[in-house]
């Protein structure tokens, strides 16, 4: 791995616009499960039936009981070396944009100043009626009956978690920013993503189509491996830790 890390470090230092995309694998080293493995969050349930706009509107009690069971452990998670190295690369000016499919807020907790969140964030919630946004602590409650459903303190409307639900469109501003970054990238890092979910999996394709080189940090193969210049099969934290050491960056 060392020789490949050294080569990639030189490319990163020489790049003018490096961009990273992170997926669930970036947070597994924080103790968080991914979504698509045999031990992932959707292993025993059809998520569309419960984490959807339809479920929130028609079965809010079931929605919030499942939501809290599946997601509440994310609120106490801490950043791991993946988040810390990427934040350090941003501070050093080596990484220009950071795009994530994750909703856990760990990039920000590690100090990343600018994160494009494609799937929303657990750090906030929004009223379905008036559209106001609030801290996520308002939905961190036990829901057993309709009287317990989190409601807007301003208008009384039902609160929706800040994550993008099934049946809901991705935020347009995030998609536009991510596409712009991918098209400008001369170096594109994929970190902890299986690249199975669109439209995020098309971002590295855009980068390559516009002349960017691709580095993939993922334990399992992806459909873009044949187009990658560098592939790291180690845990992302291990590979990025080696990269930070090669660059002389302390975390």
Curated annotation (Swiss-Prot):
Localisation: Cytoplasm
Cofactor descriptive note: Binds 1 zinc ion per subunit.
MF-aspect GO terms: histone deacetylase activity, NAD-dependent; NAD+ binding; zinc ion binding
Cofactor(s) essential for the protein: Zn(2+)
Main location: cytoplasm
Record keywords, A-Z: Cytoplasm, Metal-binding, NAD, Transferase, Zinc
Annotated positions binding Zn(2+): 127, 130, 152, 155
Catalysed reactions listed for this entry: N(6)-acetyl-L-lysyl-[protein] + NAD(+) + H2O = 2''-O-acetyl-ADP-D-ribose + nicotinamide + L-lysyl-[protein]
Residue ranges annotated for the Deacetylase sirtuin-type domain, each copy included: 1-250
Positions that bind NAD(+): 24, 28, 35-36, 101, 103-104, 119, 193-194, 218
Record-linked Gene3D superfamilies: SIR2/SIRT2 'Small Domain, TPP-binding domain
GO cellular component term of the entry, any: cytoplasm
Active site positions: 119 (proton acceptor)
EC number: 2.3.1.286
Binding site for nicotinamide: 35, 103-104
Function per UniProt: NAD-dependent protein deacetylase which modulates the activities of several enzymes which are inactive in their acetylated form.
HAMAP family: Sirtuin_ClassU
Family that this chain belongs to: Belongs to the sirtuin family. Class U subfamily.
UniProt cross-references to NCBIfam families, sorted A to Z: PRK00481.1-3 (NF001753)
Protein name, as recorded: NAD-dependent protein deacetylase
Lineage: Bacteria, Bacillati, Bacillota, Clostridia, Eubacteriales
Gene name of the encoded protein: cobB
């Amino acid at each position: 791995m060392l020789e490949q890390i050294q080569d990639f470090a030189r490319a990163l230092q020489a790049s003018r616009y490096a961009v990273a995309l992170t997926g669930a694998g970036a947070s597994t080293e924080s103790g968080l499960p991914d979504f698509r493995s045999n031990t992932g969050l959707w292993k025993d349930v059809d998520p569309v039936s419960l984490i959807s706009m339809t479920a929130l509107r028609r079965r809010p009690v079931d929605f919030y009981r499942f939501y809290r069971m599946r997601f509440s452990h994310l609120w106490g998670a801490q950043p791991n070396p993946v988040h810390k190295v990427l934040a350090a690369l941003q501070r050093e000016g080596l990484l220009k944009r950071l795009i994530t499919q994750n909703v856990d807020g760990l990039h920000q907790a590690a100090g990343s100043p600018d994160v494009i969140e494609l799937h929303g964030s657990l750090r906030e919630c929004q009223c379905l009626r008036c559209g106001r946004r609030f801290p996520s602590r308002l939905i961190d409650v036990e829901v057993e009956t309709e009287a317990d459903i989190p409601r807007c303190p301003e208008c009384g409307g039902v609160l929706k978690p800040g994550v993008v639900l099934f049946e809901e469109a991705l935020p347009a501003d995030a998609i536009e920013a991510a596409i712009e970054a991918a098209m400008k990238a001369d170096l594109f890092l994929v970190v902890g993503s299986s690249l199975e979910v669109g439209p995020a999996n098309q971002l590295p394709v855009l980068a390559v189509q516009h002349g960017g080189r691709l580095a993939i940090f993922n334990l399992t193969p992806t459909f873009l491996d044949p187009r990658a210049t560098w592939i790291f099969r180690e845990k992302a934290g291990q590979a990025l830790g080696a990269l930070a050491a090669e660059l002389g960056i302390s975390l």
